[in-house]
């Protein structure tokens, strides 16, 4: 798959899409204050078997939209703060009534937020800057970084909880963990060791949620298997579906199944083609474009409406307006929100758009894997030869630098090391090649399966960063003591400070040179 594309042009980096401006950061600091207050009272109620569903939805959606999102806008901020200013006083009153009934004194949280007063943008930015400077002054760099890490893990948990909800599965333990994480921020300074323990607890739960999500997907759509996916476009009206929530792709396909409108997937949504059920939809034609790294060009050239499913991390400020839709909790300026699974506006937009006039013939790629068959092939190799080490190479990072590194790694790794590569491939006796495509669960699935069955040392390489990567790396390191190495990531997900802290606290390393990394791992 990797040789189909040229990623010299990365719009994510070159247009600043993967960076966060100070104005946005300040507004997000203020929203964290609302989250902390909400969690304090929601946790008190939860401990007494009371779940406020409105607050639950607000907290989960705020974190899934807020963390590591460079396109978070002032409009988003106003929508969220208005909702909290409406619901928080009600939540506090609910808590007071509970305390009244129990005959206990309410434990109020001290906060600079005034719930009954709307913050204008200027005052909000000033408050956010003040909160940021307070953290810099009062917290050590390591503690600040651990808080950032735990927020990224919280985002991963929230996304998994919300995705499970689309399969009508309620993950109460996931919501409870989010409340515990947020409430830990209400302590003046939690010790680094306590934060580390909380992080380890959170990543174990997150992995459980990810397993539950995969089970739900396979129960609904069938067991994953290898499948051919076409990049060919066909003359017809078309819709592009973006993101990772395949349940929402199903909703789109159901909405257009009796219409002459084709559907194409983009980026992580490609994984849907590995589930048998989606092959039954004649409207689903294949994959379009080169992924998030090239989203500006992909979106600008697609001749129809684009549906951004929940949690899609795209900056659309530079994109053509009028054909962008989202199912997310909040929508950016110019992006039309889809509510109650009503895709009628999307369908009309597709019918009115020019669509593909001639189409373009492109090659087909084989993606996906059958886990049991793949493990069988791996175990056969382990029986045939005595291997001293196992390398697992995760999903492709799609940069020339990454390509060069892993091409060299696969060639220079000694023959007594078995390599399971989920993306890059070189034909060698000690390499098992699989194209896991955008399957973020694949790396953990194989690492966990092999760690539980064999005592051979395992090293896991993460070429690509996504919203689940930090959680997965810490889980594998702490649960199975695997070596974990991470490639260069966009600063919005993992900056150099965080990499240093991951190294010092969890012994997770950044990639250096192939020779040095091999020497360090195999010494």
Locations of regions flagged by a protein language model:
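Electropositive, gly/pro-rich neighborhoods at or near active sites that engage anionic ligands
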Residues: 35, 41-220
